[in-house]
């Protein structure tokens, strides 16, 4: 009878994972993991909503793995972790897809097509990939609640968003204004400032820059006699904006000059003079004179506009003072187009430029002669209907015709692009609704100090600095598919009125409700919400109507509202939300410090005066092997589903969680997924093999493992050691994932947790199991053998629970296979508790001896490798010379035996002193000695050369022999370097410090040579077993063909040992040329001077 399943050592992990997925689904393990935990002990994390109009990529998978690992961990720590999945439905991604598929482009086309039909298409297409998303999420082993998830386009969600806007308005944090903002002419909408900072939105752009003459229109005193015309030189990288130039700016803290060339004076900054002189030299121009011009004399100087379109504007076309003008930027004089530059707009507004005598609801009218698609309007006759980027050459041509052109150069500069269409943005004056973030900034900075960021530097670095420079947030978009800006205003400015609504039905006393004024509301989307109109109550004529402003809200406003909108707060779940906010945990990639994390922070501060989350992991980015962004166009990454099939989802998960990408670094992923393959080989398979090893031998011996509840009677030092190391692993994972100290925030260092698991797996497989194989192989069922089984079974019990959040599939398979039936799933079990391991601390000294033994072995193996002495070749002796290490001197014989067995050496001697095997070289720190005792440096050098010194207990060094001249130097004023005197010796480093020297005897006797040959034969038999596909306990029939006398003798001497170690039922020697009958049934492998033929024994059939 087998107590455990037959576990193969090299399984198809994807098949195992699919079986586990079926088990989870059929047994509803996820649902049970939530429902069995008390609501009184909830752990809240926010699942940021992805757009569902495309398939998941590795960035989504990485985020999902981190979320799932933390959620599983916290569940096993006793918390109730609800995991609602959300969908981001509104905004440009959906609209751009609809435009492409419907063949419409731009607002005019959409309005002609029909807003209702356009939005209906967006509604249906946005959820197109939800099934594929679900398949990806489930296949990666992530548990989420799809059935009770939220969608930002749902009426309940949108009502909460409407309430949030109303609350901010009510608190005086929302206003409407005209500002110059980043504008996507491809999407025909303004963008927020943080959208230009995300996803590497800046690209290198080659533009034509132009230097232009602005001719003065009045006489000025600083112009010398004989000069017929005077012009100011200004430089710009956007020549198309010159058609709406309204002013020039200088910096009065800079120096300016006038250069006379012929009958013309050209004015520019002193810093531009060298560039100007080189220009004159290239063009054979003679600069006759350069005069200094006080900057203040340039202020208010009038000039003639380069283009006539707005020449009648009042207060315009003069020189202004501006601090933003910088030395080294062009000519030191900036042309101002207030419709296309933020600084230009603010400076011109300050000076009343242009003053058209028109004010509308407190907003300054600005000449901005382009339409929504970035084309010039009829106000600019020569360029009407042309796109701003298409008129550059024509503008330069006209400047030349007017005699205003001075120079054209190619300019490569970093330029913002639309995050959705990858087209270059423009800056455009436009009307928008703003959240007044500047009012909240100081409070946000304070609240940020209460958040635990991973990595820690984000708090004061990327996020902290972003908060320091926070600007008011443009939250309205001139688009169609989104939550409406809930503002209605009078259509007649003679009877102004503005209403802001915060609910559909009248539920909250201080919140204006739509149905109070408009009747039943079925849909909050356009065009239905636009059709809600009513007479203006403040118009006694009854003619004006209250109409909604046509904008929709930025989709970032919606995702930033998800903590409460997913619950339909405050209309439902108010008590629950109030008691479970802020979230305990959140994670996304690091650029969300300027995106989702930021909008969550703004809205949470504005609405609740609280930070929105307590702990935040900012993970890095997955790139291709060249460091490029993963791209369908470049085809530079492997399909995630193929990686799951090839290596298993656990391997992909652990690759990401254990890498620096989980704490903000970047992961380079090659086309074949080699980094994932390496994880499978170095982490997943070793853990699996420890499980496989147990089941194979336990079934063979008919042994049933028992969890050790008590450590009484555990006498084997290997058992003591691995139990202690298991406890250390659990403690390290707990410390990495959370602090046990009251009031200390959770660090959530998943990478450290994974490192602890990897380190323990290495010790379990490469030290404990390998070192204890003989205990499992012995025929008799001794107490020691039973102890080995119970110890390994206990370790696997704790290991399965510890790795469950990080390797959920194989953890579950191990749990079910070893019949740990305390819970029907490892994910329903409790995470190991450090307190339950308190008894193993009695084995700490044991572990120190064992680590020292491992370090000694490592150095012996390094020496062997350096001298090409294979490990299978036994050596006669090794000698250890301790240095300041009592543990080496008094190491018990059991540990010495382990060393000998591990490194294949017959005897180990431990000397009492280093003797002649090595010596110390004294190196003095003359810089420190010269500062402290300059008068004694010569004496110290003399004493040091004598070579008599002694290290004192406090670490200082006593120079000189007793009874003679002596001197003490401090421990930081010298160092002792150990120098070995034999090429077959080396230092022993343990715990990072030298603890002695070891020497190996490399002389080989005939007996040693023959044993080495026998071990070489054994290795090739083991390789033949593997090639033949034999399982661990399968017996083999072996034939060795050779005429080599030494090989024959070695086989004869070590015959029984070879059979036992290789599980060979028969072992037969034949001459080299002997014919092997029925050769096809054998696997053949050749060594030097011999061939091995191996097949599975008939005993195994």
Curated annotation (Swiss-Prot):
Subcellular location: Cytoplasm
InterPro entries in UniProt: aa-tRNA-synth_I_CS, aa-tRNA-synth_Ia, Anticodon_Ile_ABEc, Ile-tRNA-ligase, Ile-tRNA-ligase_type2, M/V/L/I-tRNA-synth_anticd-bd, Rossmann-like_a/b/a_fold, tRNAsynth_Ia_anticodon-bd
GO MF entries: aminoacyl-tRNA deacylase activity; ATP binding; isoleucine-tRNA ligase activity; tRNA binding; zinc ion binding
Residues where ATP binds: 632
Catalytic activity, as annotated: tRNA(Ile) + L-isoleucine + ATP = L-isoleucyl-tRNA(Ile) + AMP + diphosphate
Domain of life the protein comes from: Bacteria
Keywords, alphabetical: Aminoacyl-tRNA synthetase, ATP-binding, Cytoplasm, Ligase, Metal-binding, Nucleotide-binding, Protein biosynthesis, Zinc
UniProt-listed Enzyme Commission number(s): 6.1.1.5
Motif ('KMSKS' region): 629-633
An individual GO BP term: isoleucyl-tRNA aminoacylation
Keyword flag Transmembrane helix: no
Cofactor: Zn(2+)
Motif ('HIGH' region): 50-60
One cellular component (GO) term of this entry: cytoplasm
Enzyme kind, highest EC tier: ligase
Residue ranges crossing the lipid bilayer per the database entry: none
Free-text comment on this protein's domains from its UniProt entry: IleRS has two distinct active sites: one for aminoacylation and one for editing. The misactivated valine is translocated from the active site to the editing site, which sterically excludes the correctly activated isoleucine. The single editing site contains two valyl binding pockets, one specific for each substrate (Val-AMP or Val-tRNA(Ile)).
Family: Belongs to the class-I aminoacyl-tRNA synthetase family. IleS type 2 subfamily.
Assembly behavior: Monomer.
Cited NCBIfam families: ileS (TIGR00392)
Known role: Catalyzes the attachment of isoleucine to tRNA(Ile). As IleRS can inadvertently accommodate and process structurally similar amino acids such as valine, to avoid such errors it has two additional distinct tRNA(Ile)-dependent editing activities. One activity is designated as 'pretransfer' editing and involves the hydrolysis of activated Val-AMP. The other activity is designated 'posttransfer' editing and involves deacylation of mischarged Val-tRNA(Ile).
Cross-referenced HAMAP family: Ile_tRNA_synth_type2
Record's protein name: Isoleucine--tRNA ligase
Organism: Anaplasma marginale (strain St. Maries)
């Amino acid at each position: 009878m087998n107590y455990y399943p037959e576990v193969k050592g090299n399984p198809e992990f994807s098949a195992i994972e699919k079986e586990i997925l079926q088990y989870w689904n059929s047994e509803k393990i996820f649902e049970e993991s939530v429902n069995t935990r008390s609501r009184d002990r909830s752990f809240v994390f926010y699942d940021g909503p992805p757009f569902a109009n495309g398939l998941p990529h590795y960035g989504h998978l990485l985020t999902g793995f981190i979320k799932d690992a933390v959620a599983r961990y916290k569940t096993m720590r006793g918390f109730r972790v609800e995991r609602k999945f959300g969908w981001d439905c509104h905004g440009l991604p959906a609209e751009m897809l609809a435009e492409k598929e419907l063949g419409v482009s731009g607002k005019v086309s959409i309005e002609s097509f029909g807003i209702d039909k356009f939005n209906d298409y967006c509604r249906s297409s946005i959820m197109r990939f939800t099934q594929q998303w679900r398949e990806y999420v489930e296949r990666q082993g992530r548990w989420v609640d799809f059935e009770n998830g939220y969608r930002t386009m749902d009426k309940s969600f949108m009502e909460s968003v409407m309430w949030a806007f109303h609350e901010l308005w009510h608190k005086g944090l929302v206003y409407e204004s005209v500002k110059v903002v980043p504008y996507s002419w491809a999407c025909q909408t303004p963008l927020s400032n943080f959208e230009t900072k995300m996803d590497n939105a800046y690209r290198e752009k080659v533009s034509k820059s132009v230097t232009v003459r602005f001719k003065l229109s009045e006489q000025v005193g600083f112009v010398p006699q004989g000069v017929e015309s005077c012009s100011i030189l200004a430089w710009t990288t956007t020549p198309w904006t010159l058609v709406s130039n309204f002013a020039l700016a200088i910096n009065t803290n800079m120096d300016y000059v006038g250069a006379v060339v012929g009958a013309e004076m050209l004015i520019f900054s002193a810093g531009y003079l060298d560039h100007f002189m080189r220009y004159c030299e290239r063009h054979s121009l003679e600069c006759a004179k350069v005069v200094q011009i006080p900057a203040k004399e340039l202020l208010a100087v009038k000039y003639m506009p380069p283009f006539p379109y707005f020449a009648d504007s009042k207060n315009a076309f003069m020189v202004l003072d501006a601090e933003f003008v910088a030395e080294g930027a062009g000519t030191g004089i900036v042309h101002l187009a207030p419709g296309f530059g933020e600084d230009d707009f603010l400076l011109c507004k300050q000076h009343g430029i242009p003053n058209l005598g028109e004010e509308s609801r407190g907003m300054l009218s600005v000449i901005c002669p382009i339409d929504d698609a970035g084309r010039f309007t009829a106000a600019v006759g020569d360029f009407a209907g042309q796109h701003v980027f298409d008129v550059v050459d024509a503008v330069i041509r006209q400047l030349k015709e007017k005699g205003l052109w001075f120079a054209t150069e190619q300019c490569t500069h970093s330029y913002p692009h639309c995050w959705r269409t990858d087209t270059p943005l423009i800056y455009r004056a436009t009307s928008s609704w703003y959240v007044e973030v500047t009012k909240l900034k100081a409070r946000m900075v304070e609240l940020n100090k209460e958040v635990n960021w991973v990595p820690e530097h984000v708090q004061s670095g990327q996020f902290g600095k972003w908060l320091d420079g926070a600007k008011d947030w443009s939250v309205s978009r001139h688009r169609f598919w989104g939550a409406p800006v809930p503002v209605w205003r009078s259509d007649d400015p003679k009877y102004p009125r503005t209403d802001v609504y915060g609910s559909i039905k009248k539920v909250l006393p201080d919140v204006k409700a739509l149905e109070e004024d408009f009747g039943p509301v079925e849909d909050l989307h356009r065009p239905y919400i636009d059709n809600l109109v009513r007479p203006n109550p403040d118009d006694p004529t009854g003619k004006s109507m209250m109409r909604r402003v046509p904008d929709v809200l930025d989709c970032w406003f919606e995702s930033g509202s998800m903590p409460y909108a997913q619950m339909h707060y405050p209309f439902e779940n108010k008590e629950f939300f109030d008691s479970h906010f802020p979230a305990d945990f959140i994670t996304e990639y690091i650029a969300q410090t300027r995106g989702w994390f930021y909008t969550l922070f703004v809205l949470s501060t504005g609405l609740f005066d609280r930070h929105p989350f307590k702990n935040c992991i900012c993970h890095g980015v997955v790139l291709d092997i060249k460091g490029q962004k993963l791209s369908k166009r470049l085809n530079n990454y492997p399909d995630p589903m193929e990686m799951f099939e090839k290596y298993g989802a656990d391997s992909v998960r652990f690759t990401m969680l254990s890498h620096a990408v989980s704490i903000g670094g970047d992961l380079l992923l090659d086309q074949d997924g080699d980094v994932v393959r390496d994880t499978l080989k170095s982490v997943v398979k070793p853990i699996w093999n420890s499980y496989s090893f147990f089941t194979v031998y336990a079934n063979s011996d008919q042994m049933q493992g028992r969890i050790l509840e008590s450590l009484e009677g555990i006498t084997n030092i290997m058992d003591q050691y691995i139990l202690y190391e298991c406890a250390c692993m659990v403690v390290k994972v707990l410390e990495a994932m959370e602090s046990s100290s009251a009031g200390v925030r959770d660090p959530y260092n998943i990478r450290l947790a994974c490192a602890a698991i990897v380190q323990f797996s290495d010790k379990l497989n490469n030290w404990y199991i390998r070192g204890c194989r003989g205990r499992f192989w012995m025929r008799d069922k001794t107490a020691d053998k039973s102890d080995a089984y119970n110890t390994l079974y206990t370790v696997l019990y704790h290991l399965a629970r510890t790795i469950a959040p990080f390797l959920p599939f194989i953890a579950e398979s191990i749990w079910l296979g070893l019949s740990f039936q305390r819970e029907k799933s490892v994910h329903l079990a409790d995470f190991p508790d450090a307190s339950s391991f308190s008894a193993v601390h009695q084995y700490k000294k044991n572990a120190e001896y064992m680590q020292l033994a491992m370090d000694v072995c490592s150095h012996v193996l390094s020496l062997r490798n350096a001298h090409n002495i294979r490990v299978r070749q036994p050596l006669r002796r090794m000698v250890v010379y301790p240095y300041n290490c009592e543990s080496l001197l008094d190491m018990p014989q059991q540990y010495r035996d382990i060393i000998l067995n591990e490194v294949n050496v017959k005897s180990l001697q431990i000397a009492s002193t280093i003797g002649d095997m090595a010596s110390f070289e004294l190196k003095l720190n003359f810089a420190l000695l010269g500062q402290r005792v300059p008068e004694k440096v010569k004496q110290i050098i003399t004493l040091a050369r004598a070579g008599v010194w002694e290290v004192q207990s406090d670490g200082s060094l006593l120079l000189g022999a007793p009874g003679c001249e002596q001197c003490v130097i401090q421990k930081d004023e010298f160092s002792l370097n150990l120098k070995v005197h034999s090429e077959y010796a080396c230092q022993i480093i343990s715990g990072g410090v030298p603890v002695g020297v070891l020497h190996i005897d490399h002389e080989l006797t005939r007996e040693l040579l023959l044993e080495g040959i026998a071990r070489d034969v054994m290795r090739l038999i083991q390789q033949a077993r593997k090639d033949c596909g034999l399982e661990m306990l399968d017996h083999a029939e072996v034939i060795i063909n050779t005429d080599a006398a030494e090989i024959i003798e070695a086989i004869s001497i070590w015959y029984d040992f070879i059979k036992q170690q290789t599980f060979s039922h028969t072992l037969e020697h034949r001459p080299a040329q002997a014919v092997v009958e029925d050769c096809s049934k054998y696997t053949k492998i050749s060594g030097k001077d011999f061939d091995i033929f191996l097949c599975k024994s008939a005993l195994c059939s």
